[in-house]
Amino acid sequence: MNIETLFPLDPNVKVRTRFAPSPTGYLHVGGARTALYSWLYAKHFNGEFVLRIEDTDLERSTPEATAAILEGMEWLNLTWEHGPYFQTKRFDRYNQVIDQMIEQGLAYRCYCSKDRLEQLRNEQEASKEKPRYDRHCLNHQDRSINEPHVVRFKNPQQGSVVFDDAVRGRIEISNSELDDLIIRRTDGSPTYNFCVVVDDWDMGITHVVRGEDHINNTPRQINILKALGAPIPTYAHVSMINGDDGQKLSKRHGAVSVMQYRDDGYLPEALINYLVRLGWGHGDQEIFSREEMIELFDLHSVSRSASAFNTEKLQWLNQHYMRTLPAEYVAKYLEWHMHDQAIDIANGPTLTELIPVLSERAKTLKELATASRYFYQEFDAYDEKAVAKTFKLEAEQPLTMLWEKLTALVDWNVENIHQAMNATATELGIGMGKVGMPFRLAVTGSAQSPSMDITAKLVGRERTLARLQKAIKFIQAQS
C-alpha cells in the first residue's frame, strides 16, 4: 500500500518522534512530560519532532483547547520541525486506506445492530467468556453498502503480538485477546486507533513516547501496521504522575495545567527541569540545563514506577533559576506578573535591578511581584504587629537623625546609605537594629525586606525621605 508522506522523509533522520495531544482540555503536566521526553529523545539523536493534534472527538475538541496546548508548548520552548497537523483535516486519507483494506480483505463491513451486539455480549458474559465480536458479518457481505454499517479490522486470530517497550521491556499479548477493532464508524468517521496508525506511518514516526494508559492500544495498532506493510515504531510507555498522596495527579493536588504554573509564577526552565526528573535521572544530579538534558536523556533510563509530584521541590528549582538565570531573561517573565498585579514598573527601579534583590526571598515570580509593590507605589498602612514592636517613641530620634543624614547625601548609593545608618547608630550609641528596623518599617511598611541600604537605594531618594517623614509624624501622633 502506498505511503502518503506529509513532508519529505529525510533518510538521514534516524529518529522522528511525535507529541499527539487531544484538544479536549489544557496541556497538563503529564502531557507536558510526555512531550518533553519525546522532544529530548529526538534532539539527542539530531532527529525531528512532530506535533499532531488528535481532534477526532468532535464533540469534546475545541479551538480554545488547541490554542492552550500550543501556548503551553511554546511557553516551554518545545519547538517542532513539522506540524501542527490536525486529524480532522486528514479524514480523506484515512478513508482511502480503509477502502483499500476492504478491497484487500484486511477489513470488512459489519452491519450488526446494537441489539444484536448487546445480546452477543450478554451471552458471552453469561458463559464467562471475554466479550468480543463473533465475525458474524465477515462472510455475509451481500448487504448494500448504503445500509448502516461500521468497518472492522480483520485481526489475526492466531499467534501473539510481541514488542520491546523502551521503558517496560518485552510485552506479549495473545491475538486471542484482541477483537476485530472498529476502524470506521457508522457515520463514516475513522476511529482514533486507526487514525493514529496511519498518521505514524505517513509521518515516518520511529519512536512513540506516550502514557502507560495506551499500552492496551499498542498490540491493536501494531497488527494494523503489519497488515499495511508499514514499519513498526519503537514504543515507550511512561508511568503516570501521582500526587504526593500516591493518588493520580488531579486538580485537588493543586495546579495541573502548564499555563497555571506560568500564572503561579514558575519559570519554564524550572518546570522543564522538574518534569524531566519525574521518572528519569542521571546519578544524583538535580539541576540540568537543556543542553545537558539533550546530551544525557535516554528512554531506557526512564523509570517504570509512578512518580510523585512534589510542589516544594518545584519551588526549590524555581527559586534556583530565578537566582541564577540572567536577570534580563527573568525580567521578561516577571513583567507579566507585575502587569497582572497592576504594578507600574515605570514608577520604580528596573526589573533587572529588582530581581537579584528579591529573588533570595521569593519562591515564585508571583511572590516576587507581590513583595515588590512598595518599590513602585505607596502603601496604605503599616504592618500592625511591626508597629507595636518597632514604632515606639524612642524610634523617633534615630529616624529623624537618619533622615537628616540621608537628606545631605550628594550621591544616593548603597554605600552612602549604609554609612548614614552606621553613623546614626554610632552617634546615638545604639545598636544597628534600633536604626534598621524602624527604617525598614518606615520605607516598606513591613518588618521584612532585603538589606535596607539596597532597599532604600532602589526605592529612591525622594520616596525614601518622604516615607521617613511620614513615619516620624506617625510616631509623634501615636505618643
Swiss-Prot record:
Query: What molecular function does GO assign, one term?
Result: tRNA binding
- InterPro entries recorded: aa-tRNA-synth_I_cd-bd, aa-tRNA-synth_I_codon-bd_sub2, aa-tRNA-synth_I_CS, aa_tRNA-synth_I_cd-bd_sf, Glu-tRNA-ligase_bac/mito, Glu/Gln-tRNA-synth, Glu/Gln-tRNA-synth_Ib_cat-dom, GluQ/Sye
**What Enzyme Commission number does this protein have?**
6.1.1.17
Q: Which GO terms describe its cellular component?
A: cytosol
| Reaction it catalyzes | tRNA(Glu) + L-glutamate + ATP = L-glutamyl-tRNA(Glu) + AMP + diphosphate
- Write the record's keywords in alphabetical order, separated by commas: Aminoacyl-tRNA synthetase, ATP-binding, Cytoplasm, Ligase, Nucleotide-binding, Protein biosynthesis
Q: Which domain of life is it from?
A: Bacteria
Keyword RNA-binding tagged = no
Question: What does the UniProt entry say about where the protein is found?
Answer: Cytoplasm
Protein's GO biological process? glutamyl-tRNA aminoacylation
Q: What is its main location?
A: cytoplasm
Q: Which residues bind ATP?
A: K251
Write out the residue ranges of the motif 'HIGH' region: 21-31
| Sequence motif 'KMSKS' region, residues | 248-252
**In its keyword annotation, does this UniProt entry include Cell wall biogenesis/degradation?**
no
Group of enzyme by EC: ligase
The record, for Pfam families, names: Anticodon_2 (PF19269), tRNA-synt_1c (PF00749)
Q: Which NCBIfam families match?
A: gltX_bact
Similarity-based family? Belongs to the class-I aminoacyl-tRNA synthetase family. Glutamate--tRNA ligase type 1 subfamily.
Q: What does this protein do?
A: Catalyzes the attachment of glutamate to tRNA(Glu) in a two-step reaction: glutamate is first activated by ATP to form Glu-AMP and then transferred to the acceptor end of tRNA(Glu).
Protein name stated in the entry: Glutamate--tRNA ligase
